[in-house]
Amino acid sequence: MKYYISFAWRNIWRNKKRSILATSSIFFAVFLALIMRSLQFGQYEYMVNSTVSMYTGYLQLQAKGFWDNHSFDESFELTDTLYRKMKNHAGITTINPRIETAALISHATETRISPVIGIDPYSEDKMTGLKKRLSKGNYLTEESKGILIAEGLADRLNVDVGDSIVIFGQGYQGVIAAQVFQIEGIIKYPIPKMNNAFVYMTIKNAQELFNLSNRITSIPIMINNPSKLYELRNELSSKIDTNLVIMTWEEMSPEIVQAIAVDNASGFIMLLILYIVIGFGVFGTIVMMTLERT
């Protein structure tokens, strides 16, 4: 055995330049592959974290049919039992009850259609960091009677902090919802699409406006171990009413999943090409070493 090791060692260094070149090629390929894949997976993790923390949550509790219809007819009652069951689960870090709809936002002669979100100010800030996006005015409290409005939407409506707007939409069971709200704060999103939309108010005000009593439309959920996403989803699904459903972020954001899959496939192809090129180089070295011995 020692003879073979000694023979192999002498054979490697028989042509130092060629051996160093082959070793360097392999090292370069592995190093480049590690860097490239690390950057890719880091980007994927950032995309997922941004998506779930900015809006959807890792999981989201809804009534069946709400995701497809976004109607108050598919809202559900937030009971104390349901709230405690979610709040006290060891695998859940944050639950964020919401009321989500779209309505007409009007000021003077300007009118826009915008998402209107009823939130718990503390839970929303804990999950999405909404308070740090405040550019003017004050953040909402549980006692607030006003609203927060996205900066781009405020510019389109030509409004500022202290101005009043009218929100007009359809409430629960077809009730007409219309009310005047004062702007308490303006928020700024880095994403233009989000910065040109979104109006936030407290859940209490949204329930009064849309005649929802104690009903909500969704509960985004943040968890402490994303690797157990489906395990936790299945566990929670077995403990909730059959009229409710828990969706994963992948189901709510299929475009992110598709983008990651395409980018991952392209990265794998690039690695394959790299390994083939390096493989031919190593194969050439082996052939030359063999020919020298014949």
Identify the meaning behind each predicted range.
Residues M1-S6, I246:
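Short, membrane-interfacial amphipathic segments enriched in basic
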Residues K16-Q43, A261-T294:
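Hydrophobic alpha-helical transmembrane segments of multi-pass inner-membrane transport and secretion
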Residues R37-P115, K136-E143, S238:
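Hydrophobic, regular-secondary-structure patches
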Residues A90-T93, S114, F181-G185, L244, ...:
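Small-residue-enriched segments and motifs
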Residues I99, R112-I119, R133-K204:
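Hydrophobic secondary-structure segments that place a key small or acidic residue at a functional site
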Residues G171-G267:
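Mechanotransmission and gating elements of multispan inner-membrane complexes involved in transport
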